[in-house]
């Protein structure tokens, strides 16, 4: 299958798992935050399902499609995480539109945005690290 396609497939599984977090009893607190940090809503769930579908389709299509997914997804999620770090709200889930700039503690913003920053950065890295595979 190749590394690019395998990584895209792993992203699909991970994104579908994240989309299901709100529906697994015991993982959300009284405020509806998964693990006490992530306030997931229908916009987040739709974003993660759509991203997971994109990852799965890319993984099943070709190495080139997987590389395009990893790079595009990586850029989108990395910039969303960086905006969330700066403003407290991201753009992919319409948070910056629905909630505006939020005055949150820096530690909380780091914890809340680290998954998008990490997943995005790794996607961009993997798309470059394995670019010869897609040629």
Where are these regions (language model features)?
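Membrane-interface extramembranous regions
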Residues: 1-135
